[in-house]
């Protein structure tokens, strides 16, 4: 006679084994109808699963995050049902849940087309309207093999082979279609109405380019149609903000097949890049960093000593010369240790903060490349702090404050901080891990802001802090990191002379704020939709004459603004002023200065903003003051 304890502490007793659905029905008809699954003693189970003993139970509905994941997973199975009806020779592979959606990998004789995707979506809607129950059957291993052998599902059989210890598996039946899964899944297709297929792509079996190519069908699913509509609106807005599209519109950069994953920066984009670099250079100088520069191509001997050659070689570009093997550096850390190792270091020299705008190259798979967000050639705002163990907490606390200030300057204030702690496979004593994790946790606490643990997510040699930015569309971008590392100094024989004259290994703190310049600029483009704050805009002001009579004064204003350190251009074309204003508004120039006869006579400029606000006529000196204030605010609001 199980006693079920609910989240509010109330209890219900039953005189027989009872399903989650039955418990929900005993509470109320509305809850029974909304029940997607249950969480029994903390474990997710299907609504049809039985509880035989005393247990705690949470009813899972579409309002719960777990409920939403179950809906998405079940939608992936629904893709399988529709595909097998439309394309009977297709072989189903896997259909997992991903962030805000799902996908299904499918082996088929030809690539799917957008027309195929529309047909699959239509068939899914028709199947949902049938309002059928999804039936779960725990099935003996041998029978599972028979089921998929009879259906010719070769990939499912391979997946069964991957689970030699599983003697019974969950089969989920969507009418005549059957799929294998740990579950749970929705009890009925009525939960799947708020879905949409979003895109097609290629994939490889087990993610390995050496294996068979598959078709991947992506989709999204939500608790209701209102949430789906909001998501679609957000995605449409994201498409409008696509950095590749805006990059072309604003003439910022381009990419081409002859240099995959390498950016061709145009003058406008390079201006933005240089503003970022000079800003970060100043920030680092103010915070006690020494800027260095290290080689791009380094003998494999160093990479062998650092461990990268054995663990990272497939991601490195290599070359040979005079019977020596070299690698184009994928990261800067080993080279920074070489700088530290030059000359004798004392405890008085620590902390030593070495920074580099380090150009790195990584041989990313071509299918993973994405605009300037995922590239092969990139520059990091990289730095390494060499310090004593006792200095870690202060260095970490200072870095956290610095990082948050930088993000505010770029207009990001919604920051999540996470501390990744010791993984199962690790090196170093428990005492060392305790001290390292405590130092980073104490530094996070000093910030006064909320943060969370990520248990087991640290590197094998040390814990790390991650900074994740949320942009205007609610998307998360992991950017900054602070990685505790006692391992690389050991491998590369870094040491300093302690106060007692003994040789001691320093702790090495790997840190970055932006991550890579390329990706961060891509983020900024999409966050601002190309409408950069004045300090980042490639052109901050454009001066336009109405007729040729104002040319000399327009050029004089341009020279004055550029001489004051701003980025100004004049547009002296023989075009109507309205045409010029529209064009530069579309180019998202922050300030549009119009000069007519009256402005020449009064030695003023008529100032408009790209948003269409008319600020009136003012002396050039007054506009310089206005622009100075706008630039000095950077990406912060006036109230900050």
Curated annotation (Swiss-Prot):
Catalytic class of the enzyme: ligase
Ranges for region Catalytic: 242-533
Annotated compartments: Cytoplasm
Location of the TGS domain: 1-61
Names of the cofactor(s): Zn(2+)
Biological processes annotated in GO: threonyl-tRNA aminoacylation
Gene3D superfamilies (UniProt xref): 3.10.20.30, 3.30.54.20, Anticodon-binding domain, Bira Bifunctional Protein, Domain 2, Threonyl-trna Synthetase, Chain A, domain 2
A cellular component annotation (GO) from this entry: cytosol
NCBIfam families for the chain: thrS
Function (record text): Catalyzes the attachment of threonine to tRNA(Thr) in a two-step reaction: L-threonine is first activated by ATP to form Thr-AMP and then transferred to the acceptor end of tRNA(Thr). Also edits incorrectly charged L-seryl-tRNA(Thr).
Subunit structure, interactors included: Homodimer.
UniProt similarity note: Belongs to the class-II aminoacyl-tRNA synthetase family.
Protein name (record): Threonine--tRNA ligase
Organism of derivation: Pseudomonas putida (strain ATCC 700007 / DSM 6899 / JCM 31910 / BCRC 17059 / LMG 24140 / F1)
Name of the gene: thrS
């Amino acid at each position: 006679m199980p006693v079920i304890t609910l989240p509010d502490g109330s209890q219900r007793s039953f005189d027989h084994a009872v399903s989650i659905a039955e418990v929900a029905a005993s509470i109320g008809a509305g809850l029974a109808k909304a029940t997607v699954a249950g969480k029994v003693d903390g474990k997710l189970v299907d609504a049809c699963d039985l509880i035989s003993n005393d247990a705690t139970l949470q009813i899972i509905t579409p309002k719960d995050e777990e409920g939403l994941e179950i809906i998405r997973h079940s939608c992936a199975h629904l893709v399988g049902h529709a595909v097998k009806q439309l394309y009977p020779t297709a072989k189903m592979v896997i259909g997992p849940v991903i962030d805000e959606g799902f996908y299904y990998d499918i082996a088929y004789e030809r690539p799917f087309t957008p027309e195929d995707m529309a047909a699959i979506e239509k068939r899914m809607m028709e199947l949902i309207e049938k309002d059928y129950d999804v039936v779960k059957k725990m099935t003996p291993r041998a029978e599972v093999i028979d089921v998929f052998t009879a259906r010719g599902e070769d990939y499912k059989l391979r997946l069964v082979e991957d689970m030699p210890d599983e003697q019974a598996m969950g089969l989920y039946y969507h009418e005549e279609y059957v799929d294998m899964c740990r579950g749970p899944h929705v009890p009925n297709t009525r939960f799947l109405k708020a879905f949409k297929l979003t895109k097609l792509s290629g994939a490889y079996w087990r993610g390995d380019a050496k294996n068979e190519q598959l078709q991947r069908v992506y989709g999204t699913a939500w608790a209701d149609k209102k949430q789906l509509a909001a998501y679609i609106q957000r995605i449409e807005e994201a498409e409008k903000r696509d950095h590749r599209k805006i990059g072309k519109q604003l003439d910022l950069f381009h990419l081409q097949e002859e240099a995959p994953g390498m950016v061709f920066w145009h003058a406008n984009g390079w201006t933005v890049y240089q503003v970022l670099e000079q800003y970060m250079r100043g920030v680092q100088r103010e915070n006690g960093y020494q800027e260095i520069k290290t080689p791009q191509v380094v003998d494999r001997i160093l990479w062998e000593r650092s461990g990268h050659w054995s663990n990272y070689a497939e991601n490195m570009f290599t070359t040979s010369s005079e019977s020596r093997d070299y690698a184009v550096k994928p990261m800067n850390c080993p080279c920074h240790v070489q700088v530290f190792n030059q000359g004798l270091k004392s405890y008085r020299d620590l902390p030593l903060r070495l920074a580099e705008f380090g150009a790195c190259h990584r041989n990313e798979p071509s299918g993973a490349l994405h605009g300037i967000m995922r590239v092969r050639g990139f520059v990091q705002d990289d730095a390494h702090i060499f310090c004593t163990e006792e200095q870690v907490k202060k260095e970490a606390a200072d870095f956290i404050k610095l990082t948050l200030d930088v993000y505010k300057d770029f207009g990001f204030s919604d920051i999540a901080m996470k501390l990744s702690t010791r993984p199962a496979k690790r090196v170093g004593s428990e005492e060392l891990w305790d001290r390292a994790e405590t130092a980073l946790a104490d530094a996070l606490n000093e910030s006064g802001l909320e943060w969370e643990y990520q248990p087991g997510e640290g590197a094998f040699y040390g814990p790390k802090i991650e900074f994740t930015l949320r942009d205007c569309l609610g998307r998360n971008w992991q950017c900054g990191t602070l990685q505790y590392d006692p391992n690389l100094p050991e491998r590369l024989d870094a040491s300093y002379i302690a106060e007692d004259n003994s040789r001691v290994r320093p702790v090495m703190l790997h840190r970055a704020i932006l991550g890579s310049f390329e990706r961060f600029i891509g983020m900024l483009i999409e966050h601002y939709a190309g409408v950069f704050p004045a300090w980042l805009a490639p052109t901050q002001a454009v001066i336009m004459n109405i007729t040729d009579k104002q040319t000399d004064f327009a050029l004089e204003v341009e020279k004055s603004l550029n001489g004051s350190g701003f980025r100004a251009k004049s547009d002296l074309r023989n075009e109507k002023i309205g045409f010029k204003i529209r064009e530069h508004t579309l180019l998202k120039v922050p300030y549009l200065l119009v000069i007519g006869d009256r402005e020449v006579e009064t030695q003023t400029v008529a100032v408009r903003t790209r948003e269409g606000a008319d600020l009136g006529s003012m002396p050039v000196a007054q506009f310089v003051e206005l622009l100075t204030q706008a630039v000095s605010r950077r990406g912060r609001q006036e109230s900050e």
